[in-house]
């Protein structure tokens, strides 16, 4: 089993880190509106909820079939038509989200945009259209969010749960109890991908279903050591294919809210009898699901067969509910999963914890002297970067800042989206060395401020003991930073003063300036 934070291997199983769900001391007021946007491979969804007494009540739900997953070519580039469908949908969502606070909206992109080589083109314009950042999450992080969404809408019990989510291009499996995901995996197969591969012409034949199920079983085979039948008590299915199948079965008179092997056999027989997707006549089958029902059913049948499932309950929660509750957890550092993930990374890569905490304290002190209002989240990210700035030493001390950036850019870290990890990686990469050699966005004042505070903290903590910060003040005047000390400080700490003067010279090669007034 893989650890929760591991070099990226989206198709592998790994154990999610322990994160106790303590009572959330949130600054959020009752009545606050929150929103989650799920950019799936088949559909884009918008969920709006109202925060009331620690829970989120649904206010509005919008869904549009975009089928972006079908727009990937053989080189894994999204077609312009597929991107345009996505942008048009985001424009409609943006109108509904007008006026929402930035920290109250979470937009999450999944497998199609994980795969797309030209995803940056879509994301850059999508960010501008939506008005909120789109986070491309890893497969394991998608699985964690799915479990959060499912578990939040289930009665609390000590039952061991298996949660399955079959999306357009990926399938997530999760083992967990209560709110804690204990093992997750994400497999690159789904309703859109399997329909394109095995039912491209829309024909339903026994041979096509056999080939599709065999391929799905081969993908699932590597998960059996973790997701074995004795590892869970109750199986739940969420969203997408499972929700659609559950609705079809209920309309046909099968027990509502449940899927059995016998019911799947019945549905397969119906599709084979129809012979083609266009001829399927089933109550509950929506038109947007018709082109992908064959691929979705073949994956679901393989899951039942290989994991030994006899009965699966259809869950109400899904990724978007998980994203909403994740917004709540981020309101307070103590409940932010990313904080415990950083601690796990520090332990795994044998970071010198006292020194990392020292640098984080000094960087935080400097940042607090110059940061504007509502900079708490930026301060938290600076704290994480400072705690991880020596993570690359586990590989080699020479060039450790580059090694650290590589680790963060290629890690599945619970709670983090890939852009967030890249942001931390940039800070770690740039915390030492010549600034002129780096390709950084100097127009991003928040990032530049974080970087300046981190580099100054590293210099002040060079002796790996607590520096004398009495009288040390950092100010910002436009594109100029001014660092002051009390009279006599430079004479007491000549090496620190020397390092700060070198740092000041390095900033001359950037659009920013670091001035020193050392007494």
State the predicted function of each range.
Residues 492-514:
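Short, non-transmembrane amphipathic alpha-helical segments
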Residues 43-45:
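Short N-terminal binding/cap micro-motifs at the start of the first secondary-structure element
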Residues 160-174:
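A generic, well-ordered mixed alpha/beta core segment in the N-terminal half of proteins
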Residues 29-34, 48-51, 67, 71-102, ...:
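Helical "lid/coupling" subdomains associated with nucleotide-phosphate turnover
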């Amino acid at each position: 089993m893989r650890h929760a934070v591991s070099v990226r291997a989206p198709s592998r199983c790994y154990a999610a880190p322990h994160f106790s769900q303590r009572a959330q001391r949130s600054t959020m007021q009752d009545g606050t509106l929150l929103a989650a946007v799920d950019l799936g491979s088949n559909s884009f969804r918008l969920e709006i909820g109202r925060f009331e007494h620690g829970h989120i009540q649904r206010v509005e739900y919008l869904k549009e079939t975009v089928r972006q997953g079908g727009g990937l070519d053989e080189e894994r580039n999204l077609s312009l038509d597929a991107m345009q469908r996505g942008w048009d949908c985001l424009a409609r969502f943006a109108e509904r989200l007008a006026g929402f606070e930035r920290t109250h909206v979470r937009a999450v992109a999944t497998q199609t945009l994980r795969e797309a080589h030209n995803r940056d083109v879509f994301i850059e314009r999508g960010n501008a259209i939506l008005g909120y950042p789109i986070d491309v999450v890893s497969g394991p992080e998608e699985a964690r969010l799915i479990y959060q969404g499912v578990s939040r809408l289930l009665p609390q019990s000590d039952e061991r749960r298996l949660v399955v989510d079959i999306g357009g291009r990926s399938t997530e499996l999760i083992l967990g109890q209560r709110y804690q995901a204990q093992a997750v995996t994400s497999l690159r197969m789904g309703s859109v991908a399997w329909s394109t591969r095995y039912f491209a012409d829309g024909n339903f034949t026994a041979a096509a279903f056999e080939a599709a199920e065999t391929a799905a079983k081969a993908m699932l085979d590597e998960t059996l050591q973790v997701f074995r039948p004795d590892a869970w008590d109750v199986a739940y299915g969420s969203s997408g294919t499972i929700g659609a199948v559950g609705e079809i079965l209920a309309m046909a008179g099968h027990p509502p809210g449940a899927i059995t092997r016998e019911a799947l056999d019945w549905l397969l027989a119906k599709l084979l009898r129809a012979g083609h997707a266009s001829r399927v006549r089933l109550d509950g089958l929506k038109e947007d699901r018709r082109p992908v029902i064959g691929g979705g059913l073949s994956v679901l049948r393989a899951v039942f067969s290989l994991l030994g499932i006899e009965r699966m309950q259809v869950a109400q929660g899904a990724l978007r509910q998980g994203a909403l509750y994740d917004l709540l957890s981020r309101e307070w550092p103590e409940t932010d999963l990313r904080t415990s993930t950083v601690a796990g990374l520090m332990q795994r890569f044998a970071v010198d914890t006292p020194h990392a905490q020292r640098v984080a304290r000094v960087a935080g002190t400097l940042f607090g002297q110059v940061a504007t209002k509502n900079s708490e989240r930026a301060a938290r990210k600076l704290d994480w970067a400072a705690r991880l700035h020596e993570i690359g030493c586990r590989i080699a001390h020479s060039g450790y800042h580059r090694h650290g950036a590589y680790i963060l850019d290629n890690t599945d870290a619970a709670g983090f989206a890939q852009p967030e990890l890249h942001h931390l990686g940039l800070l770690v990469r740039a915390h030492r060395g010549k600034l002129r050699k780096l390709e950084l966005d100097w127009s991003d004042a928040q990032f530049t401020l974080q970087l300046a505070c981190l580099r100054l903290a590293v210099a002040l903590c060079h002796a790996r003991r607590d520096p004398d910060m009495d009288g040390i003040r950092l100010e910002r005047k436009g594109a100029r930073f001014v660092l002051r000390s009390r009279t006599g400080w430079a004479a007491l700490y000549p090496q620190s003063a020397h390092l700060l003067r070198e740092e000041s010279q390095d900033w001359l090669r950037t659009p920013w300036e670091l001035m020193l007034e050392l007494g």
